[in-house]
């Protein structure tokens, strides 16, 4: 199902994807098959962060998940955040994925061991996507995201 050698998406393919985003409608989003595919992406041990980043860059993630779309390019004007909400969210996911790497095992053995014992990591990844869900609005995101 996946080609681990695939590195980039050709510009022509990206244009075709962009021209087809209108096909990702509520029927598409509510399809059990498509929901399973999305969860399988999160379960994927190979480059889930890169896949979601490509989905975001191509507009697919925002079309599939309209709430995420609201966070794209959304600045956070406070002392704690230097990235846009969408970039911050994908960075959180990337940091979670780092916890399962050999590099993390060498630097932070305890964190690595705790991470290895987590069952259903896809739920953790999904929660990282949800953590900034309310930041795309002008309201208190800690309340909107509940």
Language model features: what each stretch is:
Residues 78, 82-87, 97:
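Large, well-folded core regions of big proteins
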Residues 74-78, 102-117, 130:
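Flexible, glycine/threonine-enriched loop-and-boundary segments that flank and lead into catalytic domains
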Residues 1-81:
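Non-catalytic interface/linker regions that flank or bridge core catalytic/transmembrane domains
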Residues 7, 62-63, 99-106, 115-120, ...:
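Secondary-structure transition/capping motifs at alpha-helix termini
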Residues 84, 111-146:
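Divalent metal-dependent catalytic cores for phosphoryl transfer on phosphate-bearing substrates
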Residues 12-14, 54, 66-70, 105-111, ...:
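Composition- and surface-driven signal marking solvent-exposed, interaction-prone regions
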């Amino acid at each position: 199902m996946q080609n681990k050698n695939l590195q980039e998406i050709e510009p022509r393919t990206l244009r075709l994807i962009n021209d087809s985003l209108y096909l990702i409608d509520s029927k598409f989003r509510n399809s059990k098959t498509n929901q399973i595919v999305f969860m399988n992406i999160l379960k994927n041990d190979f480059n889930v962060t890169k896949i979601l980043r490509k989905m975001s860059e191509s507009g697919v993630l925002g079309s599939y998940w309209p709430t995420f779309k609201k966070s794209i390019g959304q600045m956070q004007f406070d002392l704690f955040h230097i990235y846009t909400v969408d970039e911050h969210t994908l960075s959180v996911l990337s940091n979670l994925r780092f916890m399962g790497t050999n590099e993390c095992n060498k630097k932070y053995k305890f964190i690595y061991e705790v991470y290895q014992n987590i069952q259903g990591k896809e739920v953790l990844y999904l929660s990282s996507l949800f953590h900034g869900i309310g930041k795309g609005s002008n309201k208190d995101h800690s309340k909107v995201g509940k």
